[in-house]
């Protein structure tokens, strides 16, 4: 499964919608017309199609209602929360012993006179 960040794309759309809603409520910008609700509807439809693309497990050829898309998004978020809540796997079992120079083969041990060449 490929990890994607759906937050940025939909966040921008939500911010855009929020700014438009505030402008309409304050009476700034365009006068309310039939064009404004259609563009909001297009933005929402774009967000739903984007969610549908980003959430794994949504079949490509099937029609889903907006409620079904949101339910799958919620299920996916809950699944991610469960995975993140699980403890991280620890180091593999077994003793971690430091290697002693006596255990190394003579070729791997650097003598004191050869160490001076390193620095």
Curated annotation (Swiss-Prot):
Induction line: By a variety of mitogenic agents in serum starved cells. Expressed in a circadian manner in the suprachiasmatic nucleus (SCN) of the brain and heart with peak levels between CT16 and CT20 in SCN and between CT8 and CT12 in the heart.
A molecular-function term among this protein's GO annotations: bHLH transcription factor binding
Function (record text): Transcriptional regulator (lacking a basic DNA binding domain) which negatively regulates the basic helix-loop-helix (bHLH) transcription factors by forming heterodimers and inhibiting their DNA binding and transcriptional activity. Implicated in regulating a variety of cellular processes, including cellular growth, senescence, differentiation, apoptosis, angiogenesis, and neoplastic transformation. Involved in myogenesis by inhibiting skeletal muscle and cardiac myocyte differentiation and promoting muscle precursor cells proliferation.
PANTHER family: DNA-BINDING PROTEIN INHIBITOR (PTHR11723), DNA-BINDING PROTEIN INHIBITOR ID-3 (PTHR11723:SF16)
PTM notes: Polyubiquitinated; which is favored by Ifi204 and leads to proteasomal degradation.
Residue ranges annotated for the bHLH domain, each copy included: 28-80
Region feature Interaction with IFI204, mapped onto this chain: 35-87
Main subcellular location: nucleus
Protein name per UniProt: DNA-binding protein inhibitor ID-3
Species assigned in the record: Mus musculus (Mouse)
Short name of one Pfam family: HLH
Alphabetical UniProt keywords: Biological rhythms, Cytoplasm, Developmental protein, Myogenesis, Nucleus, Repressor, Transcription, Transcription regulation, Ubl conjugation
Matches recorded under InterPro entries: bHLH_dom, DNA-bd_prot-inh, HLH_DNA-bd_sf
GO cellular component: cytoplasm; nucleus
The protein's assembly and partners: Homodimer, and heterodimer with other HLH proteins. Interacts with CLOCK and BMAL1. Interacts with COPS5 and COPS7A. Interacts with IFI204. Interacts with GATA4 and NKX2-5. Interacts with ANKRD2; both proteins cooperate in myoblast differentiation.
Biological processes per GO annotation: cellular response to leptomycin B; central nervous system development; circadian rhythm; epithelial cell differentiation; heart development; metanephros development; muscle organ development; negative regulation of DNA-templated transcription
Expression (tissue specificity): Expressed by myoblasts (at protein level).
Localization of this protein: Nucleus; Cytoplasm
């Amino acid at each position: 499964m490929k990890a994607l960040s759906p937050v940025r794309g939909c966040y921008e759309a939500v911010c855009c919608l929020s700014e438009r809603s505030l402008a309409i409520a304050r009476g700034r910008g365009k006068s309310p017309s039939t064009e404004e609700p259609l563009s909001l509807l297009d933005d929402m439809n774009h967000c739903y199609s984007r969610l549908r693309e980003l959430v794994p497990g949504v079949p490509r050829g099937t029609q889903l209602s907006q409620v079904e898309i949101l339910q799958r998004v919620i299920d996916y978020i809950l699944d991610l929360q469960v995975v993140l809540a699980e403890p991280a796997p620890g180091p593999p079992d077994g003793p971690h012993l430091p290697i002693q120079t006596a255990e190394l083969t003579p070729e791997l041990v650097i003598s004191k006179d050869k160490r001076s060449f390193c620095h």
